[in-house]
Structure formats: structure tokens, C-alpha cells
Amino acid sequence: MFIIAGLGNPGQEYENTRHNAGFMVVDELAKKHGILITKRKFKSLVGEGEILGVKVLLLKPQTYMNLSGTAVQEAVSFYKLPLSRLVVVYDDLDLPLGKIRLRLKGSAGGHRGMGSIISCLGSEEIPRLKIGIGRPAVGDVKDYVLQPFTGAEREILEPTLKLAAEAITVALTEGFNKAMTDFNRGG
């Protein structure tokens, strides 16, 4: 079993914001593989199912971004999974919009949701998929991540969400190294 944890903020006001790119990828996986994310468990909305024969728990923490680690830790502890069976999906300011990047480990890179997970799990050796949202040309980063994607950005984002879902599918079925080779291009 794998846990796929998409990071974001709960509530309708954050639904289409840049900071919720992780939720969007998990929703894309759910749609593509017929998994309903309706249960409340582990301080999260969850859905259990299979992706090409691999059992998964899709997890959307409802703790707000900066406390995501508490929800992810509960799920990992409950299933007694090694961290290699967790994939965290989140937005990345340092990647251009339209790019994705898979990593097996690393620092939080300033992302507070990932920082919370690293702190709660006590390790940086956590597989992750980062969704590029780019940096604002001007203005505050905090305001930028909490703003919705523009119409033009959504045109770039939609195929990126599908690409991210495909990358996770390859990681689960053919291995993370194969997925990194196939999907970590450009950016």
C-alpha cells in the first residue's frame, strides 16, 4: 500500500489557489482511477482504492498547510508504512508553471507543509512530487500562493495535473527511479 498525500488548505476559499496544487493532483488521480475521496480520517479527507493493481490511500489533510505533518504522520503510523511508501505532492515556487519534479528525498525548500511533514516524521527521506507554480513577478509570495490560478495559468495547469498523475502512476507501478527518468525533464 502507498499513501499519496496531496497538500493544500481546506475550504472553498482556497479551492483553486496555487497552494492547493497538491490537492488538485490527488483529485486528478481519484478521477482517473475511480476513487472517491469522501471519508474523514487522520484529520484528512481520504479515499482508498487501487491504481493499476496497487493499493493506495489518497489523503488530503484538512489541518491547513502548515500543520500537514500531523495528518500525514497519523496515516503513516496507522498503516505502519515505511516512508518509501509515502508520496507527498505539493506546489513549488522554484519550478516554473507547467513543470513537475519527482524527488526521493530532500529538504522542505522553504515549503511549510513539507517542513511540517519532515518535522513530524523525523526524516527528509520522503518521496515527493513537486508541481511548479512559478514565482510572482512582483508582490508578496504569501499572497501569491493563496491566489487562484488565472485563466491563462489554468490552461497550462490542466495538462500538468494529468502529467503529475501519470508520473505518480509510473512511480507506483514501475518504480520511483523510472518515474524520475521519464518525468524530470526541463524546468
Swiss-Prot record:
The keyword Amino-acid biosynthesis does not apply. GO terms for cellular component: cytoplasm. It is found in: Cytoplasm. GO terms for biological process: protein quality control for misfolded or incompletely synthesized proteins; rescue of stalled ribosome. Its EC number is 3.1.1.29. InterPro entries: Pept_tRNA_hydro, Pept_tRNA_hydro_CS, Pept_tRNA_hydro_sf. The record marks N9 as: Discriminates between blocked and unblocked aminoacyl-tRNA. The keyword Endoplasmic reticulum does not apply. The active site is at H19. Belongs to the PTH family. Monomer. HAMAP family: Pept_tRNA_hydro_bact. Hydrolyzes ribosome-free peptidyl-tRNAs (with 1 or more amino acids incorporated), which drop off the ribosome during protein synthesis, or as a result of ribosome stalling. This is Peptidyl-tRNA hydrolase. It comes from Carboxydothermus hydrogenoformans (strain ATCC BAA-161 / DSM 6008 / Z-2901).
